[in-house]
Regions:
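Surface-exposed coil loops of outer-membrane beta-barrel proteins
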Residues: 22, 38, 43-60, 89-105, ...
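Outer-membrane beta-barrel channels and translocator barrels
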Residues: 26, 73-77, 113-115, 162-165, ...
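Cleavable N-terminal export/targeting peptides
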Residues: 1-26
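Glycine- and aromatic-enriched membrane insertion/assembly motifs of diderm outer-membrane
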Residues: 56-87
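Residues on the lipid-exposed face of transmembrane beta-strands in outer-membrane beta-barrel proteins
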Residues: 33, 37, 63-72, 105-110, ...
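Outer-membrane beta-barrel pore domains
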Residues: 52-55, 89, 94-95, 99, ...
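Outer-envelope exported proteins of Gram-negative bacteria
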Residues: 30-34, 80-82, 119-121, 170, ...
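Short N-terminal segments immediately surrounding and downstream of signal-peptide cleavage
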Residues: 22-37
Length: 355
Protein backbone atom coordinates (compact mmCIF):
# COMPACT_ATOMS: atom_id res chain seq x y z
CA UNK A 1 0.00 0.00 0.00
CA UNK A 2 2.83 2.38 0.90
CA UNK A 3 4.51 1.76 -2.45
CA UNK A 4 1.26 2.56 -4.30
CA UNK A 5 0.88 5.83 -2.41
CA UNK A 6 4.49 6.87 -2.94
CA UNK A 7 4.58 6.25 -6.69
CA UNK A 8 2.38 9.17 -7.83
CA UNK A 9 3.96 11.54 -5.32
CA UNK A 10 7.47 10.85 -6.62
CA UNK A 11 6.35 10.92 -10.24
CA UNK A 12 4.80 14.37 -9.84
CA UNK A 13 7.90 15.65 -8.07
CA UNK A 14 10.29 14.41 -10.72
CA UNK A 15 8.19 15.43 -13.73
CA UNK A 16 8.17 18.96 -12.40
CA UNK A 17 11.70 19.22 -13.80
CA UNK A 18 10.28 19.40 -17.29
CA UNK A 19 8.26 22.51 -16.50
CA UNK A 20 10.09 24.36 -13.75
CA UNK A 21 11.91 27.48 -14.85
CA UNK A 22 15.37 27.74 -13.30
CA UNK A 23 16.02 31.34 -12.31
CA UNK A 24 19.74 30.81 -12.63
CA UNK A 25 21.23 30.21 -16.06
CA UNK A 26 24.51 28.98 -14.60
CA UNK A 27 25.31 25.35 -15.36
CA UNK A 28 28.35 23.16 -14.96
CA UNK A 29 29.50 19.94 -16.60
CA UNK A 30 32.06 17.73 -14.89
CA UNK A 31 33.64 14.66 -16.46
CA UNK A 32 35.37 12.11 -14.26
CA UNK A 33 36.44 8.53 -14.79
CA UNK A 34 38.91 5.75 -14.24
CA UNK A 35 40.75 2.85 -15.84
CA UNK A 36 42.00 -0.19 -13.94
CA UNK A 37 43.79 -3.47 -14.52
CA UNK A 38 45.13 -6.21 -12.26
CA UNK A 39 47.20 -9.38 -11.97
CA UNK A 40 46.15 -12.13 -9.57
CA UNK A 41 47.92 -15.30 -8.47
CA UNK A 42 45.92 -17.85 -6.49
CA UNK A 43 48.07 -19.95 -4.16
CA UNK A 44 45.87 -22.98 -4.91
CA UNK A 45 46.35 -22.28 -8.63
CA UNK A 46 42.62 -22.22 -9.31
CA UNK A 47 40.27 -19.37 -10.14
CA UNK A 48 37.48 -21.49 -8.63
CA UNK A 49 38.78 -20.42 -5.20
CA UNK A 50 37.24 -17.02 -5.82
CA UNK A 51 33.69 -16.32 -4.54
CA UNK A 52 33.68 -12.51 -4.75
CA UNK A 53 33.11 -10.00 -7.54
CA UNK A 54 35.46 -8.76 -10.27
CA UNK A 55 38.64 -10.83 -9.60
CA UNK A 56 37.71 -14.29 -10.86
CA UNK A 57 41.07 -15.26 -12.38
CA UNK A 58 44.38 -16.99 -11.69
CA UNK A 59 47.82 -16.09 -13.07
CA UNK A 60 46.30 -13.61 -15.50
CA UNK A 61 46.69 -9.93 -16.27
CA UNK A 62 43.21 -8.61 -16.93
CA UNK A 63 41.65 -5.19 -17.58
CA UNK A 64 38.96 -4.26 -15.11
CA UNK A 65 36.85 -1.36 -16.37
CA UNK A 66 37.09 1.87 -18.31
CA UNK A 67 34.62 4.27 -16.74
CA UNK A 68 33.48 7.79 -17.55
CA UNK A 69 30.90 9.83 -15.66
CA UNK A 70 29.14 12.91 -17.05
CA UNK A 71 27.56 15.11 -14.40
CA UNK A 72 25.71 18.25 -15.51
CA UNK A 73 24.25 20.58 -12.87
CA UNK A 74 22.22 23.73 -12.70
CA UNK A 75 21.05 25.31 -9.47
CA UNK A 76 18.16 22.84 -9.12
CA UNK A 77 18.59 20.09 -11.69
CA UNK A 78 21.28 17.44 -12.10
CA UNK A 79 21.78 14.88 -14.86
CA UNK A 80 24.19 11.96 -14.41
CA UNK A 81 25.28 9.49 -17.09
CA UNK A 82 27.82 7.05 -15.64
CA UNK A 83 29.16 4.54 -18.17
CA UNK A 84 31.52 1.61 -17.77
CA UNK A 85 33.08 -0.87 -20.20
CA UNK A 86 34.88 -4.10 -19.38
CA UNK A 87 34.39 -7.24 -17.33
CA UNK A 88 33.88 -5.30 -14.09
CA UNK A 89 31.01 -3.30 -15.61
CA UNK A 90 29.56 -6.44 -17.17
CA UNK A 91 29.47 -8.26 -13.82
CA UNK A 92 27.96 -5.19 -12.16
CA UNK A 93 25.09 -5.07 -14.70
CA UNK A 94 24.78 -8.86 -14.91
CA UNK A 95 21.08 -8.77 -15.88
CA UNK A 96 21.74 -6.63 -18.97
CA UNK A 97 23.10 -7.64 -22.37
CA UNK A 98 25.36 -5.90 -24.85
CA UNK A 99 25.73 -2.15 -24.68
CA UNK A 100 23.04 -1.93 -21.97
CA UNK A 101 25.53 -3.48 -19.54
CA UNK A 102 27.66 -0.37 -19.97
CA UNK A 103 25.16 1.81 -18.11
CA UNK A 104 26.23 1.95 -14.46
CA UNK A 105 24.07 4.92 -13.52
CA UNK A 106 21.65 7.07 -15.48
CA UNK A 107 19.40 9.46 -13.60
CA UNK A 108 18.03 12.97 -13.28
CA UNK A 109 17.53 14.81 -9.98
CA UNK A 110 15.46 17.86 -9.11
CA UNK A 111 15.93 19.89 -5.91
CA UNK A 112 13.00 22.28 -5.38
CA UNK A 113 14.67 23.42 -2.15
CA UNK A 114 17.83 22.83 -0.14
CA UNK A 115 16.14 20.19 2.03
CA UNK A 116 14.60 17.87 -0.57
CA UNK A 117 15.76 16.20 -3.78
CA UNK A 118 13.79 13.92 -6.13
CA UNK A 119 15.63 11.40 -8.32
CA UNK A 120 14.39 9.21 -11.19
CA UNK A 121 16.44 6.66 -13.10
CA UNK A 122 19.06 4.08 -12.17
CA UNK A 123 21.67 4.64 -9.45
CA UNK A 124 24.18 2.70 -7.32
CA UNK A 125 22.73 1.19 -4.17
CA UNK A 126 22.79 2.93 -0.81
CA UNK A 127 23.42 -0.43 0.86
CA UNK A 128 26.97 -1.34 1.89
CA UNK A 129 30.42 0.19 2.30
CA UNK A 130 32.16 -0.70 -0.96
CA UNK A 131 31.52 0.67 -4.46
CA UNK A 132 31.88 -0.61 -8.01
CA UNK A 133 34.41 2.11 -8.95
CA UNK A 134 37.86 0.85 -7.86
CA UNK A 135 39.27 4.33 -7.16
CA UNK A 136 36.65 4.74 -4.42
CA UNK A 137 37.80 1.64 -2.52
CA UNK A 138 41.09 1.04 -0.73
CA UNK A 139 40.97 -2.74 -1.21
CA UNK A 140 40.88 -3.87 -4.83
CA UNK A 141 39.16 -7.22 -4.28
CA UNK A 142 35.60 -7.08 -3.01
CA UNK A 143 33.91 -8.27 0.16
CA UNK A 144 31.37 -11.09 0.33
CA UNK A 145 28.75 -8.58 1.42
CA UNK A 146 29.27 -6.40 -1.65
CA UNK A 147 29.27 -9.45 -3.92
CA UNK A 148 25.87 -10.56 -2.68
CA UNK A 149 24.33 -7.21 -3.39
CA UNK A 150 22.36 -5.28 -4.08
CA UNK A 151 24.36 -3.44 -6.77
CA UNK A 152 21.93 -0.80 -8.02
CA UNK A 153 18.30 0.32 -8.11
CA UNK A 154 16.08 1.68 -10.87
CA UNK A 155 13.10 3.72 -9.80
CA UNK A 156 12.15 6.88 -7.93
CA UNK A 157 13.43 8.23 -4.63
CA UNK A 158 13.30 11.32 -2.45
CA UNK A 159 16.18 12.53 -0.27
CA UNK A 160 15.57 14.84 2.69
CA UNK A 161 18.12 16.83 4.69
CA UNK A 162 17.51 17.93 8.28
CA UNK A 163 20.65 19.65 9.52
CA UNK A 164 23.20 16.92 10.19
CA UNK A 165 20.67 14.16 9.54
CA UNK A 166 19.26 12.85 6.30
CA UNK A 167 16.59 10.44 5.13
CA UNK A 168 15.76 8.71 1.87
CA UNK A 169 12.70 6.77 0.78
CA UNK A 170 12.05 5.28 -2.63
CA UNK A 171 10.48 2.61 -4.78
CA UNK A 172 12.37 0.60 -7.39
CA UNK A 173 12.31 -2.32 -9.78
CA UNK A 174 13.38 -5.71 -8.46
CA UNK A 175 17.00 -5.46 -7.34
CA UNK A 176 19.64 -5.07 -10.08
CA UNK A 177 17.10 -4.83 -12.91
CA UNK A 178 17.12 -1.73 -15.10
CA UNK A 179 14.67 -3.44 -17.43
CA UNK A 180 12.34 -6.04 -15.93
CA UNK A 181 11.74 -8.95 -18.37
CA UNK A 182 8.26 -9.62 -19.70
CA UNK A 183 6.31 -12.49 -18.20
CA UNK A 184 7.83 -12.36 -14.71
CA UNK A 185 6.69 -10.96 -11.38
CA UNK A 186 7.27 -7.21 -11.41
CA UNK A 187 6.71 -6.00 -7.87
CA UNK A 188 8.34 -2.81 -6.65
CA UNK A 189 10.92 -2.82 -3.87
CA UNK A 190 10.91 -0.35 -0.99
CA UNK A 191 14.14 1.58 -0.29
CA UNK A 192 14.96 3.56 2.84
CA UNK A 193 17.92 5.19 4.58
CA UNK A 194 18.64 7.30 7.63
CA UNK A 195 22.01 9.05 7.88
CA UNK A 196 23.87 11.18 10.38
CA UNK A 197 26.93 13.02 9.06
CA UNK A 198 27.78 15.49 11.77
CA UNK A 199 31.53 15.43 11.14
CA UNK A 200 34.34 13.23 9.80
CA UNK A 201 34.76 11.94 13.34
CA UNK A 202 31.52 9.98 13.13
CA UNK A 203 29.13 9.18 10.28
CA UNK A 204 26.44 6.50 10.30
CA UNK A 205 24.07 5.18 7.64
CA UNK A 206 21.13 2.87 8.38
CA UNK A 207 19.86 1.21 5.21
CA UNK A 208 16.96 -0.96 4.11
CA UNK A 209 15.78 -2.65 0.92
CA UNK A 210 12.95 -5.14 0.62
CA UNK A 211 10.40 -6.59 -1.76
CA UNK A 212 9.34 -9.53 -3.89
CA UNK A 213 11.87 -10.68 -6.49
CA UNK A 214 11.08 -11.98 -9.96
CA UNK A 215 11.61 -15.57 -8.70
CA UNK A 216 8.72 -15.00 -6.18
CA UNK A 217 11.03 -14.95 -3.13
CA UNK A 218 10.58 -12.17 -0.58
CA UNK A 219 13.67 -10.33 0.63
CA UNK A 220 14.28 -7.93 3.50
CA UNK A 221 17.79 -6.58 4.01
CA UNK A 222 18.97 -4.30 6.81
CA UNK A 223 22.41 -2.71 6.66
CA UNK A 224 24.59 -0.34 8.68
CA UNK A 225 27.70 1.60 7.65
CA UNK A 226 29.82 3.56 10.13
CA UNK A 227 32.93 5.62 9.35
CA UNK A 228 35.22 7.50 11.70
CA UNK A 229 38.32 9.61 11.08
CA UNK A 230 40.26 9.44 14.33
CA UNK A 231 43.24 11.47 13.10
CA UNK A 232 44.90 12.66 9.89
CA UNK A 233 46.66 9.29 9.69
CA UNK A 234 44.11 6.79 10.98
CA UNK A 235 40.48 6.08 10.13
CA UNK A 236 38.14 3.14 10.26
CA UNK A 237 34.96 1.86 8.70
CA UNK A 238 32.40 -0.76 9.59
CA UNK A 239 29.72 -2.53 7.56
CA UNK A 240 27.17 -5.00 8.83
CA UNK A 241 24.27 -6.49 6.90
CA UNK A 242 21.60 -9.15 7.36
CA UNK A 243 19.18 -10.38 4.70
CA UNK A 244 16.14 -12.59 5.18
CA UNK A 245 14.81 -14.57 2.21
CA UNK A 246 11.42 -16.30 2.09
CA UNK A 247 11.17 -18.77 -0.80
CA UNK A 248 7.83 -19.48 -2.52
CA UNK A 249 6.80 -23.16 -2.27
CA UNK A 250 3.95 -22.93 -4.78
CA UNK A 251 1.33 -22.00 -2.20
CA UNK A 252 2.95 -19.51 0.13
CA UNK A 253 6.31 -18.07 1.12
CA UNK A 254 8.06 -20.42 3.52
CA UNK A 255 9.70 -19.34 6.77
CA UNK A 256 12.59 -16.99 6.14
CA UNK A 257 16.22 -18.05 6.03
CA UNK A 258 18.97 -15.50 6.36
CA UNK A 259 22.58 -14.73 5.57
CA UNK A 260 24.61 -12.00 7.21
CA UNK A 261 28.03 -10.40 7.24
CA UNK A 262 30.20 -8.03 9.24
CA UNK A 263 33.40 -6.26 8.20
CA UNK A 264 35.87 -3.88 9.83
CA UNK A 265 38.17 -1.63 7.76
CA UNK A 266 41.31 -0.24 9.40
CA UNK A 267 43.03 2.53 7.40
CA UNK A 268 46.51 3.89 8.08
CA UNK A 269 47.99 6.76 6.02
CA UNK A 270 51.55 7.58 7.15
CA UNK A 271 51.98 9.94 4.18
CA UNK A 272 49.70 11.35 1.46
CA UNK A 273 51.44 9.03 -1.03
CA UNK A 274 51.16 5.77 0.94
CA UNK A 275 48.39 4.03 2.83
CA UNK A 276 47.47 0.63 4.24
CA UNK A 277 44.04 -0.95 4.70
CA UNK A 278 43.17 -4.15 6.53
CA UNK A 279 39.70 -5.54 5.88
CA UNK A 280 38.49 -8.30 8.20
CA UNK A 281 35.14 -9.80 7.19
CA UNK A 282 32.98 -12.54 8.65
CA UNK A 283 30.34 -13.92 6.29
CA UNK A 284 27.69 -16.36 7.51
CA UNK A 285 25.79 -18.47 4.97
CA UNK A 286 24.35 -21.08 7.33
CA UNK A 287 21.45 -21.95 5.02
CA UNK A 288 23.48 -22.27 1.81
CA UNK A 289 21.88 -19.27 0.13
CA UNK A 290 24.96 -17.62 -1.38
CA UNK A 291 28.02 -19.92 -1.58
CA UNK A 292 27.61 -22.25 -4.61
CA UNK A 293 29.61 -25.32 -3.54
CA UNK A 294 28.54 -28.93 -2.81
CA UNK A 295 30.52 -28.91 0.46
CA UNK A 296 28.26 -26.13 1.74
CA UNK A 297 25.02 -27.65 0.45
CA UNK A 298 24.13 -29.61 3.60
CA UNK A 299 25.11 -27.32 6.47
CA UNK A 300 26.03 -24.07 4.77
CA UNK A 301 29.28 -22.38 5.72
CA UNK A 302 30.83 -19.31 7.26
CA UNK A 303 33.91 -17.54 5.97
CA UNK A 304 36.46 -15.36 7.73
CA UNK A 305 38.38 -13.33 5.15
CA UNK A 306 41.31 -10.97 5.78
CA UNK A 307 42.67 -8.66 3.10
CA UNK A 308 45.71 -6.40 3.46
CA UNK A 309 46.11 -3.76 0.74
CA UNK A 310 48.73 -1.07 0.24
CA UNK A 311 48.01 2.09 -1.75
CA UNK A 312 50.96 3.79 -3.47
CA UNK A 313 49.86 7.06 -5.07
CA UNK A 314 51.65 8.91 -7.87
CA UNK A 315 49.55 11.83 -9.11
CA UNK A 316 46.32 10.24 -10.40
CA UNK A 317 47.69 6.70 -10.38
CA UNK A 318 47.26 4.27 -7.47
CA UNK A 319 49.21 1.00 -7.30
CA UNK A 320 47.60 -1.61 -5.02
CA UNK A 321 49.54 -4.73 -3.97
CA UNK A 322 47.22 -6.97 -1.96
CA UNK A 323 47.34 -10.21 0.05
CA UNK A 324 44.14 -12.08 0.90
CA UNK A 325 43.42 -15.16 3.04
CA UNK A 326 39.93 -16.72 3.22
CA UNK A 327 39.10 -19.37 5.84
CA UNK A 328 35.86 -21.38 5.60
CA UNK A 329 34.08 -23.76 7.96
CA UNK A 330 33.67 -26.15 5.00
CA UNK A 331 36.10 -27.40 2.36
CA UNK A 332 34.95 -25.11 -0.44
CA UNK A 333 38.46 -24.30 -1.74
CA UNK A 334 41.07 -26.47 -3.49
CA UNK A 335 44.81 -26.98 -3.11
CA UNK A 336 47.33 -27.16 -5.96
CA UNK A 337 46.84 -30.93 -6.22
CA UNK A 338 43.07 -30.54 -6.48
CA UNK A 339 42.22 -31.82 -3.00
CA UNK A 340 39.65 -29.84 -1.02
CA UNK A 341 40.67 -27.44 1.74
CA UNK A 342 39.11 -24.88 4.07
CA UNK A 343 41.68 -22.16 3.31
CA UNK A 344 42.53 -20.17 0.19
CA UNK A 345 44.94 -17.32 -0.40
CA UNK A 346 46.05 -15.09 -3.23
CA UNK A 347 48.28 -12.18 -4.18
CA UNK A 348 47.00 -9.38 -6.37
CA UNK A 349 48.62 -6.35 -7.96
CA UNK A 350 46.30 -3.67 -9.35
CA UNK A 351 46.76 -0.31 -11.06
CA UNK A 352 43.98 2.29 -10.96
CA UNK A 353 44.12 5.61 -12.81
CA UNK A 354 41.39 8.15 -12.08
CA UNK A 355 40.64 11.68 -13.24
Amino acid sequence: MLRKLLAPIFTIGVLTTAFAQDSSKTSALSITGSVDAYYKYDFGQSKANNYTSFTNSHNRIEPGMASVKFDHKTSKVELVADLGFGKRAQEFSYNDDGILAGVKQLYVSYSPSSVVKFTAGSWATHVGYELVDPQLNRNYSMSYMFTNGPFFHTGLKADFTFGKSGAMIGIANPTDFKYVPEGVINRKFLLAQYSYTGSDLFKVYLNYVGGKAIDTSKTNQFDIVVTSKLSDKFSLGYNGTVASIKVWDGVKNMDGKSWWGSALYLNLDPTPAFGLTLRSEYFNDKYDLKIPHPAAAMNGCNIFANTLSANFKVDNLTIIPEFRIDNSSQEIFTKKDGTPTKTAGNFLLAAVYSF
